[in-house]
């Protein structure tokens, strides 16, 4: 197992610049710092004499968001936590989407959907985050066979995986509200 930086991955077929081997994403032990949890402290520049341009870069990098964490329960008794800047749209959530790498995917995928989910996860692992997040990329995904319950109205809603949801962003899970979000509308 080797870790490569983005600039070491070349071509549309995503191969290693050194040996030409196809590059795939793998789950490896690594460290992440959740800067958003410390956003208020990190954004306190009162003691720093930084140029405004640098302060703006820091604000954008830290990514402070106002909103609410909401927990959806699954039929299997698991909990899917999402973060939303629009808690008022909870009533309109009609499905959920997990990142293909989300740890709950294994536990909520039905036996009937397992093969299709595994194939999709492998396909997503061959794409870079930049490719997955591209605005012009077709939104694709597969149904896990699992369901969650909307916490405000109790409705049973399907849980999908899709490569436009990133495990490294937020909780790696979203509630989908097609009436209020263009990506959710396109995916639906």
Where are these regions (language model features)?
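Conserved, charged catalytic cores of large soluble enzymes
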Residues: 1-137
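Catalytic alpha/beta core of large soluble enzyme barrels
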Residues: 102-187
């Amino acid at each position: 197992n080797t870790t490569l930086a983005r600039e070491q991955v070349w071509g549309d077929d995503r191969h290693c610049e050194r040996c030409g081997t196809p590059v795939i994403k793998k789950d490896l032990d690594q460290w992440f710092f959740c800067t958003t949890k410390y956003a208020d402290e990190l954004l306190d520049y009162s003691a720093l004499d930084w140029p405004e341009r640098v302060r703006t870069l820091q604000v954008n990098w830290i990514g402070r968001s106002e909103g609410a964490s909401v927990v959806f329960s699954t039929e299997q008794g698991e909990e899917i936590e999402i973060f939303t800047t629009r808690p008022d749209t909870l009533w309109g959530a009609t499905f959920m989407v997990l990142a293909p790498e989300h740890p709950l995917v294994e536990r909520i995928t039905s036996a009937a959907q397992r093969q299709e989910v595994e194939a999709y996860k492998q396909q997503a692992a061959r794409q870079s985050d930049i490719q997955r997040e591209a605005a012009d990329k077709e939104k694709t995904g597969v149904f896990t066979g699992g369901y969650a319950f909307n916490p405000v109205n109790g409705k049973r809603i399907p849980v999908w995986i899709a490569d436009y949801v990133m495990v490294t962003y937020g909780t790696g899970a979203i509630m989908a509200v097609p009436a209020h979000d263009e990506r959710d509308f396109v995916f639906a």
